[in-house]
Amino acid sequence: MVTAPLLGWVAVRPIPRLSKLNTCKYVSSSLQSYKRSVGSCLGKQQSRDFSYSATLTDAGINLEKTRNIGIIAHIDAGKTTTTERMLYYSGFTRRIGDVDDGSTVTDFLPAERARGITIQSAAITFHWPPLAADGTSSGPSLEELESQNLPRSRASHTVNLIDTPGHADFTFEVLRSLRILDGAVCILDGVAGVEAQTEKVWHQASVYQIPRVVYVNKLDRDGAAFGRTVREVGSRLQGWPAVCQIPWFEGGNGRFTGIADVISLQGLLWKEGGDGKSVKVFDLAGLENEDKRLAEELKHARVALVELLSEHDEDMVESFFEHEDHLKVPPMTILKSLRKCLLGPEAQKIIPVFAGSSFRNMGVQPLLDAVNNLLPGPSESVDPEISLGNSKGSLGNLLSGELTLQQEPKTANIAKPKQKKKTAVAPTSVDTKHLAANLESCALAFKVVSDAKRGVLVYVRVYSGTLNKGCQLYNTNLHVTERAPRLFKMYANDAVEVDSIPAGHIGVVSGLKYARTGDTLISCTGSKMTPPEPLNTLQLRPIDVPPPVFFASIEPHSLSEEKNMQEALALLLREDPSLHVTVDEDSGQTLLSGMGELHLEIARDRLVNDFKAKATMGRIEIGYRECVLGQSNPVTKIFDREVAGRKGKAGCTAVVEPYDPESGEPSSGGEDIIFAEIVEGNRIIISAPGINISTDKRGKEESSSLPSQFDVNSFRTSLYNGALSALARGPQFAFPMHNTKVTLTCNVVEHLFGSDSSASALSAAARLATQGALRDLATGQNSGTGIMEPVMNVIISIDEASLGAVVHDISSARGGHIISLDEEMPISTSIGGNDSPESEQVVIDVNKIYAPPDPFETPSVAGGLPIQASANQTRTITAKVPLKEMVGYLKHLRSLSAGRGTFVMHVDRFERMSAQRQKAVLAELHR
């Protein structure tokens, strides 16, 4: 046997003329000597559907050869370890980084290396298969590969990889990464199976319709069960597992030594203790001589894979009828069918599953080939959603001129109540064909990082056109124009300056002063600083920020340090929008809110160590909410004072009352309503009698009743901002208001005073009126306000022996409510109120899932084994528990489950406390 290490890896087929395969030895040699030796024995080299023999193609920009992928998983599943192997085999690094040693490329923050976890997502670009030594390639194009019936993995692809956190406290990091991905690799721990955070992130990825493959990792560990994990993929991830590889255990029950590839019907055997670059490859005949039991299982797996694909792809049915044998269906036909199912309408139903052990350097290169072969490029991914004016559509339709603006004559965001029938007014259609010619580039800022050397770095995904160095970028969210002085390609913590970032790629812009996470950045033709209407309203689908549930006070060491602390907080919030900063009006304390205890601890470390703020963080507290218990009297306030040296006068009337989000579609009042939306758990309604809104030819709202300094949008926004400001602090307990309905009435005749009325004065009047209505309610005899607490959706994973103790603890001592055992329902992961495409759930019969037998199980297979096959089977508890009772719960759970229990939680809703519980909480807060 001859093998030869390449930059990536080498898979060498055993030479048939040798009588004993086990006499093969690993020998280092050059690629040329490898070709000569194999060629002399075989006459013609047999091809393998992996990338070991790839001569690489042009390294230039090619969207078909670009992959924007993410690594998603539960904490400690092996995401960063797998990423480090990918970088090593691609030639990006010369050694393999280790999480325990703190030597990884993608975990570069001091806190990440100290804790051994990923805290912030890291972007890195590499090529697979690796480029030639001079950085160029000369391999075939995808068209040539197609004509030769060869896989895509024979041509070098540019892989933009994002390694995401696994800890639940850093969910926002995962969300903003998912927003810009075209595909993802979901890594599962072969011992733990499908864990709670994995399930949560999987369903979040489904919201964005991201094609995914599953990689079952850690199969070298004791207790690893690939077959059981495959069945859990079907039952918990709501899809049919397409088993593309099965593990190779020495002697059937021994150590993990390699994998058997179901697509190519080959066995891959790695050298024990090696770096994973040298692999022996056995065809089916050779595998029968080496491990007959594995060869038989491989045949079963191939039959199951072809049968599964035949149920979802007619081309596979035709291929099977043509060859009349599951084993004779060509590997390329299977690859094409898998890709078709993964990218087409069946994308949520078929889940390709691969196997390996990244720490032992086994299975990573075939996984990289699967990324090239199965996952989509930017041009094949879902057309991004956009809003333009008050209309919604897709960016592709806008660029092709097929998007037509439908401008309602009044407002587009209002849930209209049932009214008497009126004469219908047709919406105004605005042609957008001319807009595509004006749009040079469109990008989404998905992350902002403060770098000590380079300043503020804004990570962007370019969706159309090319973002060029020095171009003028218009921020459609903030309505400001900034120049992009420098562009970079990021390699974890290192950066390489580039002249442009093309469509479909991820890059970094430095020098932007205002851009935030979720902002849309566009550049247009011409010399004007502001794009023409309605192009200046173009916005890509934003990144939704989950609500914070913990907070802590931040105090500077001295008054002289307060300015530096505030500047550091501003940088921290620009980096991480899931953090919130508020100031308590009574005490003057600055409060920092976040997603969890660890989230706030990391924020404190960054504030003190990275931004050098001289400040101290107080005790971490729970973020409660305040709700109204009755309806207030109408309160009218007239704001009349100077603002910034100019006279300002405006008035407004406000009424507050309880709002029940579960009561169905709420009524929004009469026909004078110009705004009615749910914002941060509250409903804000704005009524403007006498405003008389009309729509011009461009679809813009206008009103002749408003003073000249107002347009309809600024009038509406001023009132909205005033109400929002008042709702940030309750009248009795100073918590933010929740489940509160505010109705603002601004009569343009009575409450506006010509040129004296300004936007700031109107906003102040709305704030004063809303605050007055809240105080009126708080001082009333039969009403007032109450406290609401966050209730968490908790998913607990424990073994069978600990089930009873944990259930009793949750339902009694912690006041929780058990929803289900063994997760009968998928985790709710609504993002921004959008329903997942998985609302039409795939019905999975676990008994029909093919799964290979695990070590020490009876060989079997197409019928599979029941999920409850083991006495030590992990059980899953789903419960609703008040957040207060979950603080510090992990330590208690581990004591109940002998250290084996884990849990993940996210905010389900806010619930009003009982009087007794509210009294206890207030007493604790006033200590």
Curated annotation (Swiss-Prot):
> Where does it live in the cell?
Mitochondrion
Q: Which cellular component terms (GO) are annotated to the entry? A: mitochondrion
Name the domain of life: Eukaryota
What coarse category fits the chief subcellular location reported for this protein? mitochondrion
The UniProt annotation places GTP binding at: 73-80, 163-167, 217-220
**A GO term for molecular function:** GTPase activity
Q: Return the similarity comment.
A: Belongs to the TRAFAC class translation factor GTPase superfamily. Classic translation factor GTPase family. EF-G/EF-2 subfamily.
Functional note = Mitochondrial GTPase that mediates the disassembly of ribosomes from messenger RNA at the termination of mitochondrial protein biosynthesis. Not involved in the GTP-dependent ribosomal translocation step during translation elongation.
**Entries under PANTHER family matching the protein:** RIBOSOME-RELEASING FACTOR 2, MITOCHONDRIAL, TRANSLATION ELONGATION FACTOR G-RELATED
What name appears for this protein in its UniProt entry? Ribosome-releasing factor 2, mitochondrial
